UniProtKB/Swiss-Prot annotation:
Subunit structure: Monomer.
Pfam families (UniProt xref): Abhydrolase_6
GO molecular function terms noted in the UniProt entry: 2-succinyl-6-hydroxy-2,4-cyclohexadiene-1-carboxylate synthase activity
UniProt entry keywords in alphabetical sequence: Lyase, Menaquinone biosynthesis
PANTHER family: 2-SUCCINYL-5-ENOLPYRUVYL-6-HYDROXY-3-CYCLOHEXENE-1-CARBOXYLATE SYNTHASE (PTHR42916), PROTEIN PHYLLO, CHLOROPLASTIC (PTHR42916:SF1)
Lyase keyword on record: yes
Enzyme Commission number: 4.2.99.20
Biological role stated in the UniProt entry: Catalyzes a proton abstraction reaction that results in 2,5-elimination of pyruvate from 2-succinyl-5-enolpyruvyl-6-hydroxy-3-cyclohexene-1-carboxylate (SEPHCHC) and the formation of 2-succinyl-6-hydroxy-2,4-cyclohexadiene-1-carboxylate (SHCHC).
Gene Ontology BP, a term: menaquinone biosynthetic process
Protein name: 2-succinyl-6-hydroxy-2,4-cyclohexadiene-1-carboxylate synthase
HAMAP family: MenH
InterPro entries: AB_hydrolase_1 (IPR000073), AB_hydrolase_fold (IPR029058), SHCHC_synthase_MenH (IPR022485)
Keyword DNA-binding: no
Length: 252
């Protein structure tokens, strides 16, 4: 089994860019940024529970990484950079720490390296469980209205919140809930030590108004790019700034 994806071919002999979206996003999320790198092959993946992969069930990160590897093989992608936002960034970090073959470099935007104690994991398990129940049983417009009131999204304007709520409400609540539980921070290991031992380039992007993830970026051995005029979802709030950072990283 493989994940649904959109593939855009580039020039032969270049490393591919593999884009992983955030929770409740889909393969379209990164395209405004990725299409500025038309010389590279680009693969935009729908993670399990999302978009064209909504019906694909997973029990945890191991299943997600296995599906990611199968998808890369199916497109004959042998050398690649992983570029992931939030949930996609956590999947990318997990894949990197597990030694996914062919990985040339890692770019994470606003991805959490992992909780560091059992109390924090227990609290997160309860919180994600409550959200999952809401996704399963309540209208998605109501759930996402509240979702975007969380402190991490404080930099969004009312108009941006409204647009995101309308966009994300097109999802399937049941499959979102299942993916939220399967990949919760409560079940993700603390990746700091493994990330600090990576043998390939690791870059971290965060919005200048995202104080939580700017602090987390200092806890991993990554080169940090701060995106101006942006909060947690920097590639949506300032795509040109993220394009500039990626161009520097990839030396394009």
């Amino acid at each position: 089994m493989m994940l649904h994806a959109q593939h855009m071919p580039g020039q032969p002999g270049t490393s591919s860019l593999v884009f992983l979206h955030g929770f409740s996003g889909d393969c379209r999320e990164w395209q405004p940024v990725g299409e500025q790198f038309h010389g590279c092959s680009r693969l935009y993946i729908d993670l399990p529970g999302h978009g064209g992969s909504a019906a694909i069930p997973v029990g945890g990160f191991a299943d997600v990484i296995r599906l990611l590897r199968a998808t890369l093989i199916s497109y004959n992608i042998l050398k690649f950079w992983l570029v992931g936002y939030s949930l996609g960034g956590r999947v990318a970090m997990m894949a990197a720490c597990q030694g996914i073959p062919g990985l040339c470099g890692l770019v994470v935007e606003g991805g959490h390296p992992g909780l560091q104690n059992e109390q924090a994991r227990a609290e997160r398990r309860l919180s994600d469980g409550r959200w999952a129940e809401r996704f399963r049983h309540e209208p998605l417009t109501e759930v996402f209205h509240d979702w975007y009131q969380q402190p991490v999204f404080a930099s969004l304007t009312a108009q941006q919140r409204q647009a995101l709520t309308a966009l994300r409400s097109q999802n399937n609540g049941e499959t979102l809930a299942a993916m939220l539980e399967a990949t919760s921070l409560a079940v993700q290991p603390d990746l700091r030590e493994a990330l600090n031992a990576l043998a390939f380039p690791f870059y971290y992007l965060c919005g200048e108004r995202d104080s939580k993830f700017r602090a987390l970026a200092q806890e991993v051995a990554a080169t940090c790019h701060v995106i101006r005029n942006a909060g947690h979802n920097a590639h949506r709030e300032n795509p040109a700034g993220v394009v500039d950072s990626l161009a520097q990283i990839l030396r394009l």
